[in-house]
Every structure is written in structure tokens, then in C-alpha cells.
Amino acid sequence: MNKWLCCALLVLLDIIEWTTQETLPPKYLHYDPETGHQLLCDKCAPGTYLKQHCTVRRKTLCVPCPDHSYTDSWHTSDECVYCSPVCKELQSVKQECNRTHNRVCECEEGRYLEIEFCLKHRSCPPGSGVVQAGTPERNTVCKKCPDGFFSGETSSKAPCIKHTNCSTFGLLLIQKGNATHDNVCSGNREATQKCGIDVTLCEEAFFRFAVPTKIIPNWLSVLVDSLPGTKVNAESVERIKRRHSSQEQTFQLLKLWKHQNRDQEMVKKIIQDIDLCESSVQRHLGHSNLTTEQLLALMESLPGKKISPEEIERTRKTCKSSEQLLKLLSLWRIKNGDQDTLKGLMYALKHLKTSHFPKTVTHSLRKTMRFLHSFTMYRLYQKLFLEMIGNQVQSVKISCL
């Protein structure tokens, strides 16, 4: 009989436990020695521990966990759990310990947890590409490149890339690609011309230099009237005013003026005079020889809309190695509504500090930005701007970026 009663009580307790979990706070059974009755008490919430069981006169007393300890679920324990003291080797803190959560650690970038160790992500060999990027919990997943795709580098991030369609660039296929090599297209002067950059870094710095420290009334109209050559029409000026902020309007106007007057002697002279700047930028950036993966990482670190892997690969096909980074920065600027490229690079460099990006490249980018902001370039911009517009607005105070 006693055995039967024990079984019945256990079943009853299970039923009570199941039904009470459906309500908050969940309940638990407690024998009250004062009355001799079983009471339904509230469990303690996450972040607290049980100080006193409930009675017929008062509810359960729960108090906050002390520092460096926690509880992460509804419970009836009279103590909290100590937080893990430190993260293991090659791990960093993902979430600090608090009263409701233990300290959460994860493997540093480029590694994943395998049992107790942070191992490096697998690198896919040439002929294979990444189909699932590695995470702090999972290794990289590689797969052989299917027909029509290739990967020519060892990488833990780069996917297989589609073979170049030579006809898209007006070229002939002279050697079919395979899993490790791209199609080889016939060389053609037209291909190098397609790398054209609408506004170089130096021209952009020069055009942005022309923005006054304080915008004066009708500044854009004054500038339109002062520029030599074919005038930018009123409709275009109004469109610039509608679409862009006052600080951005000067850059947009000068960019459009340059496009309309590219065959004018004045524009040719300005471009020739900026060659000093361009050659210095090439000295800093022209020998970077970045891989597809590195170009992708740099473009990903820029704010705003991103340059796609396909655009990066297309740039690598149509531009010389010394032009690829500059072309991609130009594409980023256009895609993001002519945002300031140098400000975008400053943002990117802050984020690249935490990644395994080549320090020689970040150093070159910083040197380039310092050069474009230098006093020597300020004097050159000032000289060119005053030559371009004559003496009509020399009184306007010009600020260098």
C-alpha cells in the first residue's frame, strides 16, 4: 500500500511540476513544518537565489546574486554559481559575467573551438572555394570549384569565382580556364581604357578643397559664372542643389564641370599640374599588389554600400595592379552617392586594426591621406583653384580638407 501511495505521489508531483511551469513565476512544492502542509512556493528568478521558503503568511524571499556569480534560470537553489574566472588561451570575452549570465568566451578571429582548443580555420587550397565561412564555433567548409568557376589562391575566406567572360570586355578567349585558373583573354588596349576612374583621389581632394569654410549666399551661382569653358546649365545646378547638402554641392559642380570640359585646355592644364599629386599617390599605393581576399576585406571595412566580390574580380581583370585599389575606391564613392573617399578610408583603417590586414598597406594608406592633407598640397590646390576661376572670388576663404 505504501509503495502504491509513493508512486501516486511521484506522478502527482510530476503533473504539478509540469502545469506550474506554464505560469510565471513557476512554482515548487515545499513542506511547511509550522503547519504540516505542502505549499506551492514561487521559484527564484534568474539573477537571484533563495533566502527563505514561502509560508502561509509570506511569499518566497529571493535576493540578488553577489558580484562574480549568477543564476540563469528559475530555480530553488540557496546559492548562486560562480562565474568562470578567465577565458582560455586564444579566446576573448564575448559577454562579461553578470547576475543572470556566466562569462561567455569565444575564439579570436580566424579560429574556432574544437573540444578545448582554438584551432585556425581551414584554408581552402587552389581549386576549392569557401562555401561556409568559419566562425568562432565552426571550421571553414571548402568545396571543389564546379565547372565554370575557379580559385587560384589558398584562402579561408575566398569563394570560387566565375570564369571571366572575355566577350563582355570585347576580348577573345585564347585559353580556357579550369578549377585553378581563370580564362585567358587576348590583350587589348580597349580593356585598359575600361579601367577609367572618373575622379582620382587627387582630383577629389582638390575639388573638395574648393568648398568654402562658410558657405556664402549664392556661392554655387558665383562659382558657375566664374568657371571657364562650357557652363554647367541651370537645370543641372538645380538638380545638384536638390540632391546634395551645401557642403557637397561644390564637389558635384566641379565634377560635372570637369566632365563637360575634359577637352578644354584649362582642364588639361589642371590635370597636368595634379600629376605631381598622382605620382606621389602611386608611389604610396601602386606597389601594394593586394590579393582578392585583401581587396575584399578592405572594401568590406568601408562604411555604407559594399563593393561586391564580382566587381572586385572585374576590376582585377580590367585594371593594372597599380590601379586596382584606386579604381575600387572610386567605385565605392560612386555607389555611396559621392561620399568623401578619404573620410571613408579613415573609417576603414580604424576597423582594419583588429584584423590580420597587411600593415604595409595600412601604413601606405595613412601616408597617402597625410600627403593629400599636407601644406604643400594645400598650396597646390590654392594655386590651381585661383588659376581656374581667375580673380573673381579670391576673397572667399578656402579651407583644405
UniProtKB/Swiss-Prot annotation:
Occurrences of domain Death (ranges):
198-269, 283-365
- Tissue specificity: Highly expressed in liver, lung, stomach, intestines and calvaria. Highly expressed in decidua and placenta, and in embryo.
Induction text: Up-regulated by TGF-beta and estrogens. Down-regulated by 1,25-dihdroxyvitamin D3 and parathyroid hormone.
Which cysteine residues pair off into disulfide bonds?
A: 41-54, 44-62, 65-80, 83-97, 87-105, 107-118, 124-142, 145-160, 166-185
Q: Which residues are glycosylated?
A: 98, 165, 178, 289
Which Pfam family is one of this chain's hits?
Answer: TNFR_c6
**What UniProt keywords are attached to this protein's entry?**
Apoptosis, Disulfide bond, Glycoprotein, Receptor, Repeat, Secreted, Signal
Q: What InterPro entries does UniProt report for this protein, alphabetically?
A: DEATH-like_dom_sf, Death_dom, TNFR/NGFR_Cys_rich_reg, TNFR_11, TNFR_11B, TNFRSF_decoy_receptor
Main localization of the protein described in the UniProt heading: secreted
SUPFAM superfamilies xrefs: DEATH domain (SSF47986), TNF receptor-like (SSF57586)
Establish whether keyword Translocase is in the entry.
Answer: no
The outcome of changing residue 296 to R is:
In strain: 129/Ola and NIH Swiss
According to the UniProt record, one GO cellular component term is: receptor complex
Record site: Involved in dimerization: 400
Q: Kindly state the subunit structure of this protein.
A: Homodimer. Interacts with TNFSF10 and TNFSF11.
Stated role? Acts as a decoy receptor for TNFSF11/RANKL and thereby neutralizes its function in osteoclastogenesis. Inhibits the activation of osteoclasts and promotes osteoclast apoptosis in vitro. Bone homeostasis seems to depend on the local ratio between TNFSF11 and TNFRSF11B. May also play a role in preventing arterial calcification. May act as decoy receptor for TNFSF10/TRAIL and protect against apoptosis. TNFSF10/TRAIL binding blocks the inhibition of osteoclastogenesis.
Specify the protein name: Tumor necrosis factor receptor superfamily member 11B
